[in-house]
């Protein structure tokens, strides 16, 4: 594909062809800036990575709106396009070269489908899929091999269920959702009542709702509650190996990284970001636009827009100051001991 074809399809107006229309190389693929070879398109996200322009073997670059970087690329004969959001444009460009596998609609003969299930149009149901009573599947849904769908589940249009995921009873999956392999949606919440003779099992009669455009990573689990619902909001993206307990309410547009765990009844507002291995205690709330850095332990509510770190969670700026002091503790301790010894000597005079 010619570079000119790429900028046309991406609808980019600021690019090197306006200055040198004859330099229009063939681009055959995409690559990271430090791995790119001739005929590759790559990107640089900001001025602090400008040194890569002198080192890369890429034939084309997506650059920020920085004239110095554009001139540097031009001097090396690298064609470029510019945008306020290079990473976003790079993501859009990938789709010009790669499309994920999409099977042709069919129902495989080994699939087991209960006669009361309702299947929409243009649906793919792969080998050894099990669909139980009362299930409703929308149009254009893709269900890869070995998926198990429990009774009375609803799956919205164009959603994709990858191999070996499980959707348990009465779960509601919205449109354009993607659920990756090994995920379990709607499993029983951890509900046991202590008695004198042991634990009494509380039946989990609730259900899980995934709103439209939710992505669920591999081996993530989202539990249903004893009553009511566990809900994941519109356009929220959840990584691999995340545990979301019974009754959690997750707002729209959140991003949750791997190995995060939420206890029961946690509430996240809109656009909350959780980095890897965050733990959130029972019933804690995080306000709209708040962020928790990696390995944060959240025991209490977090205000809207607040960034927290550490265990127990504290404001991120304070956490950084504590970290700076922590690395100096040995020297500070030695200075303290010296002062203490001097004080002891003076007190003995």
Curated annotation (Swiss-Prot):
NCBIfam families: lipid_A_lpxD, PRK00892.1. Keywords: Acyltransferase, Lipid A biosynthesis, Lipid biosynthesis, Lipid metabolism, Repeat, Transferase. Homotrimer. This is UDP-3-O-acylglucosamine N-acyltransferase. It comes from the Bacteria. PANTHER family: UDP-3-O-ACYLGLUCOSAMINE N-ACYLTRANSFERASE, UDP-3-O-ACYLGLUCOSAMINE N-ACYLTRANSFERASE 1, MITOCHONDRIAL-RELATED. One of its GO terms (cellular component) is membrane. Pathway: Bacterial outer membrane biogenesis; LPS lipid A biosynthesis. Its EC number is 2.3.1.191. Belongs to the transferase hexapeptide repeat family. LpxD subfamily. GO terms for biological process: lipid A biosynthetic process. Catalyzes the N-acylation of UDP-3-O-acylglucosamine using 3-hydroxyacyl-ACP as the acyl donor. Is involved in the biosynthesis of lipid A, a phosphorylated glycolipid that anchors the lipopolysaccharide to the outer membrane of the cell.
